[in-house]
C-alpha cells in the first residue's frame, strides 16, 4: 500500500519534470583498477551517447580475441520498435559506430549475451512475440541465427540465463497474475539450455511486490557475494538498481535479500539506471540523462 501511494506521488513529479526536461538513455563503461567492490568506482566511467533521435540502453559486455564489445538496444524515437546493435570499445574511452545485428518485426531489447565453450549465444527480450528466444552467433559479433524458443506463449521480459551448480536457471519477469512487469520474479531451470526441458520453480513467483523485481543484468559476484541486479521503478521506469544477494538457489529453494542500492549519483543530471553488466574489472551500465528543454 505504501509503495502504491509513493508511486502516485512520483508519477506526478515525473510529469512535472517532463514539462521542463528532455530525457534519453545512454551507456557508461570502463575498466576499473580492481574488481568492482565499491559504488564509487562507477563515478569515472566513459560515456556513450546516441544521436539525437536514438536511444542506447540495455547494455551487455562481451570479450573476444582481445577485443571488447558492448551489445545493446537501439530505439529510434520516431519508430520505437527496438532493435539490437553492437559496438567495440577501447581503453582510451573511444568506440566504433554502432552496427545493427538484429532487426525483426517485433520489439527487441536486453541482448543478454553469454558463451558456451567457444560459441556465443544471446537471449534477447521478445515479449511482444510472446516468446523467450535463444539466438546463436555464427560470425562474431554481427551474424546471428535463431537457435530455438526457450519458452512460448508467455509474456516475459529481461530473461536472464545463469549457470549454477550444474543447472541452467532462467530468471524472468512475467505478468502472470499481476499488472506490471517487475511485480514478480519467476524462475525456471534445466540441465541443458541448448536442448532444454524447462521446469518451473515450485516457489514461483520467487519474489512478488510492486515493480521492484525485474532483472537488471546478469548475476555477478560483488564483495564475494553472489548478487542479482534488479530494477526498482518506484520513482520512474528504471529509477535505480538494487543488488540482491542470492542466499539460496536450487530446484527447490530460492532466497534473496537486499544488499546494495545503485543510484545514478555519478552525475546530477542523471535520473535513473536500469541495467548493469560486470565482468571482473569491466563495468557497463546504462543511465538516463535529463537536459533542459529549449524555450
What function would you assign to each model-found segment?
Residues 1-295:
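Carbohydrate-active catalytic/glycan-binding domains of CAZyme proteins
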Amino acid at each position: 500500500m505504501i509503495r502504491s501511494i509513493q508511486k502516485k506521488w512520483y508519477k506526478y513529479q515525473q510529469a512535472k519534470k517532463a514539462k521542463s526536461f528532455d530525457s534519453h538513455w545512454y551507456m557508461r563503461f570502463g575498466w576499473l583498477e580492481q574488481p568492482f567492490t565499491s559504488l564509487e568506482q562507477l563515478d569515472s566511467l566513459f560515456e556513450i551517447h546516441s544521436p539525437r533521435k536514438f536511444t542506447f540502453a540495455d547494455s551487455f559486455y562481451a570479450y573476444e580475441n582481445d577485443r571488447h564489445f558492448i551489445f545493446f538496444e537501439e530505439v529510434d524515437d520516431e519508430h520505437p520498435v527496438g532493435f539490437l546493435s553492437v559496438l567495440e570499445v577501447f581503453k582510451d574511452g573511444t568506440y566504433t559506430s554502432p552496427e545493427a545485428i538484429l532487426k525483426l518485426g517485433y520489439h527487441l531489447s536486453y541482448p543478454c549475451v553469454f558463451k558456451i565453450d567457444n560459441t556465443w549465444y544471446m537471449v534477447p527480450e521478445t515479449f511482444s512475440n510472446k516468446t523467450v528466444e535463444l539466438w546463436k552467433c555464427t560470425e562474431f559479433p554481427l551474424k546471428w541465427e535463431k537457435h530455438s524458443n526457450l519458452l512460448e506463449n508467455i509474456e516475459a521480459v529481461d530473461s536472464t540465463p545463469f549457470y549454477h551448480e550444474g543447472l541452467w536457471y532462467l530468471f524472468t519477469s512475467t505478468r502472470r497474475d499481476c499488472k506490471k512487469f517487475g511485480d514478480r520474479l519467476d524462475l525456471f531451470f534445466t540441465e541443458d539450455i541448448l536442448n532444454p526441458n524447462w521446469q518451473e520453480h515450485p516457489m514461483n513467483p520467487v519474489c512478488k511486490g510492486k515493480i521492484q523485481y525485474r532483472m537488471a543484468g546478469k548475476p555477478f559476484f560483488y564483495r564475494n557475494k553472489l548478487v542479482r541486479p534488479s530494477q526498482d521503478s518506484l520513482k520512474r521506469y528504471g529509477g535505480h538498481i538494487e543488488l540482491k544477494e542470492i542466499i539460496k538457489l536450487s530446484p527447490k529453494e530460492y532466497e534473496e535479500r537486499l544488499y546494495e542500492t545503485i543510484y545514478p549519483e555519478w552525475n546530477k543530471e542523471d535520473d535513473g539506471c536500469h541495467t548493469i553488466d560486470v565482468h571482473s574489472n569491466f563495468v557497463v551500465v546504462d543511465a538516463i540523462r535529463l537536459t533542459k528543454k529549449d524555450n
